[in-house]
Amino acid sequence: THSIHSQYFVPDWDLAYMLTEEREGYNPRPVDQAAVFHAYKDYAVGFSTYSEGVNDDVNKIIWSMLGWDPDTKPIEILREYAGYFIGQDLAEGFAQGLLALERNWRGPLISNAGVDTTLQMFREMEKKASPQAKLRWRFQMALYRAYYDAYVRSRLLYETSLEDQAMEKLRQARNSGVTLALSEAEALLDRSLTNPVAQDLRARLYELAEALYQSVRAQLSVDKYQAISVGRGANLDTTDVPLNNRLWLKQRFAEIRSLPTESERLAAVDEIVNWTNPGPGGFYDDLGNLARQPHLVRGPGYPSDPAHLKSSYVNLGSTGYGPRRLPGVIHSQAASFEQEEMYPISWWSTA
């Protein structure tokens, strides 16, 4: 049912997804759901299916079908699901599309080019779909996810590049002067607002959100569709949450400008530039960045430990969207690291 803050959360979910798609977004996870079922089926007699809403529609079907026949393959269930609810002409494509949506959430988003392929799959299905199929909420919701994932990835690539360019301006502060370096860096960071990327994807998201409200009364926004709160499935309201350190950097820039001397301002800029530099002989692990955890002891992971009782667990801290440095993550247990003869060690997290 829930992607984070739950018993069987999405493993290794990218922070960009956590910040935008949130806890109760549409989350077809057929492979993960089957892994949970098979990990614990020998400890139970019988089964029941639990659901909190339409967002986990695929998962409850997977669970129910496995309860009847544990040997059924997830793809077989998805084909039957798609044929019954969407149409036999789209059954194979839609079933494969649901698997692709699950793969969209595997590992670092910035390097997951499959997200764009998934969107193309659903766009092709949309072209072929009958008018009746296009009105079915299950079809609309999968489309919404495909567009949402692609929009988040487009923004992540863009905003990461803008921050990289801004940091290069800060590295030149000793030559250009702090005032100019801050102004140029800030202008680059603000391009995410003045020249936003992938607005066609964003516009389509809003169209699909309206379609879902009309077809099944999906409440994807607090103001537009009267959702209880942003964290309760209203991820239309978080589509544009910053995916880089723009808010934190701009706050720091304001503080630096207030410092009385150039030497103090330069020292503060150096602190930002060298934030992830632990010094000679050290290493820096970022426990909220899936691509920067080489020393983290991950444990068995899926499928043998789907509840992460013995595995590392990265999740989103519920501290709001204020100007703080990303990532803001929590760990459900003490993090363990491989021992190496190199000190000091630096790592970033919020406990």
Residue ranges of model-derived segments:
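C-terminal non-catalytic alpha-helical accessory regions
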Residues: 51-59, 71-293
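Glycan-recognition and processing domains
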Residues: 266-350
